[in-house]
Amino acid sequence: MDWTWSILFLVAAATGTYSQVQLVQSGHEVKQPGASVKVSCKASGYSFTTYGMNWVPQAPGQGLEWMGWFNTYTGNPTYAQGFTGRFVFSMDTSASTAYLQISSLKAEDMAMYYCAR
C-alpha cells in the first residue's frame, strides 16, 4: 500500500510542477499597414533557456501555422518558409521574455500570434 501512495504522490507532484509554467503575452494591438509591431512573451515557472520558444500565428478563419522557433540557449532563430525578412525573433534572457517583431505590416499579416514552449 505504501508504494501506491508514493506513485500517486509523484503523479500529483509532477502535475503541480507543470501547472506552474506560464507564458504571458502582450496585449491586443491594432496597427496600420506599413507599421511595425513587437509582441512579447514572458515565461515563468521554468528555466527560460532550457526550452526553445515557438511562434504560431492563426489568421481569421484559418488553422494554426508554425512560423519558426527561437533557440533560447544559443540565441539562434529558425524561420519557416514564408516568414523571413520582415519577421524577427529575439529575446531578453534576464527578463525571461521572447519577442516577435514584424515590420512593414501587410493586410495578410492580420492574425493572432501565439508563443509556445
Swiss-Prot record:
Residues 20-117 form the Ig-like domain. Residues 1-19 form the signal peptide. One of its GO terms (molecular function) is antigen binding. Disulfide bonds join 41-115. Residues 45-52 are annotated as: Complementarity-determining-1. GO terms for cellular component: extracellular region; immunoglobulin complex; plasma membrane. Residues 116-117 are annotated as: Complementarity-determining-3. SMART domains: IGv. Residues 78-115 are annotated as: Framework-3. One of its GO terms (biological process) is immunoglobulin mediated immune response. Keywords: Adaptive immunity, Cell membrane, Disulfide bond, Glycoprotein, Immunity, Immunoglobulin, Immunoglobulin domain, Membrane, Secreted, Signal. Residues 20-44 are annotated as: Framework-1. Its main location: secreted. It is found in: Secreted; Cell membrane. Glycans are attached at residue 76. Residues 53-69 are annotated as: Framework-2. SUPFAM superfamilies: Immunoglobulin. Residues 70-77 are annotated as: Complementarity-determining-2. Immunoglobulins are composed of two identical heavy chains and two identical light chains; disulfide-linked. Probable non-functional open reading frame (ORF) of V region of the variable domain of immunoglobulin heavy chains. Non-functional ORF generally cannot participate in the synthesis of a productive immunoglobulin chain due to altered V-(D)-J or switch recombination and/or splicing site (at mRNA level) and/or conserved amino acid change (protein level). Immunoglobulins, also known as antibodies, are membrane-bound or secreted glycoproteins produced by B lymphocytes. This is Probable non-functional immunoglobulin heavy variable 7-81. The gene is IGHV7-81.
